[in-house]
């Protein structure tokens, strides 16, 4: 099954990634991806783009050759208070805000601290999707996080890269997250976390977990471009208003 939406990609602006926006568009056309988010690492990461990179994302076209582009960021959770490394009115210029734990910015500590930091990030209202919450380096109280995400309308990511490239040992945690999300009504999204365009839309391992727990397709943000855009608009991203009409006739892939 080919999903048409990918919410998590990195370009050469993050210097440990290897593809340009043009590369992603070309691969998206080949694979039938209709909408993807450009979400380079937040500026607190050592090799992340400069702050101005995110401010200037408005120069990106909305649509190129039938492929929609979301202007976003994968911000870094900085502390137990759930603060991230992007702020203020600049957040309103973005279409989508992801955030997660990254060792160079917020080193692992203990389960209680990780849980409090993640829940505070969810409660902040600044973040739409929590990335790779199944990372075994950052154990969390999965049920507490899933409940908070459901309450505040924040999506949890099942990160496909965690099974193939990094964060090895994530399978059990991600399965538990998917089960908790099913139980508590939490929104899920699959993210490729592509650092090279060839893996855009690669969700095979994440999809296996979604299928294993019989998570409802109606709550999966990848199901259609309009599903993701409606979610983002409901979360206050007025910037997606000009994209919504371009996908008004789409049909869920599943």
From Swiss-Prot:
It holds the Pfam family PHP. It comes from Shewanella baltica (strain OS185). Its EC number is 3.1.3.-. Binds 3 Zn(2+) ions per subunit. It comes from the Bacteria. This is Probable phosphatase Shew185_1467. GO terms for molecular function: phosphatase activity; zinc ion binding. Zn(2+) 2 binds at residues 16, 41, 195.
């Amino acid at each position: 099954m080919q999903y048409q939406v990918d919410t998590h990609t990195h370009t050469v602006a993050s210097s440990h990634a290897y593809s340009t926006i043009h590369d992603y568009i070309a691969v998206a056309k080949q694979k039938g991806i209709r909408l993807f988010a450009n979400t380079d690492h937040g500026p607190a990461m050592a090799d992340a783009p400069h702050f101005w990179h995110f401010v200037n994302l408005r120069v990106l076209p909305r649509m190129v050759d039938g492929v929609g582009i979301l202007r976003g960021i994968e911000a870094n959770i900085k502390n137990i208070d759930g603060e991230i490394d992007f702020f203020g009115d600049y957040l309103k210029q973005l279409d989508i805000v992801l955030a997660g734990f990254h060792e160079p910015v917020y080193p692992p500590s203990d389960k209680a601290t990780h849980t409090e930091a993640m829940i505070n990030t969810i409660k902040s209202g600044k973040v739409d999707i929590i990335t790779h919450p199944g990372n075994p380096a950052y154990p969390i109280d999965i049920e507490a996080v899933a409940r908070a995400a459901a309450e505040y309308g924040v999506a949890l990511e099942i990160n496909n890269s965690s099974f193939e490239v990094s964060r090895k040992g994530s399978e059990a945690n991600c399965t538990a997250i998917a089960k908790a999300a099913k139980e508590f009504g939490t929104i899920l999204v699959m993210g490729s976390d592509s650092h090279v365009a060839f893996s855009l839309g690669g969700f095979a391992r994440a999809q296996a977990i979604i299928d294993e727990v019989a998570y409802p397709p109606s709550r999966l943000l990848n199901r259609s471009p309009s599903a993701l855009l409606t979610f983002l608009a409901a979360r206050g991203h007025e910037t997606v208003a000009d994209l919504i009409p371009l996908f008004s006739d789409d049909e869920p892939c599943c």
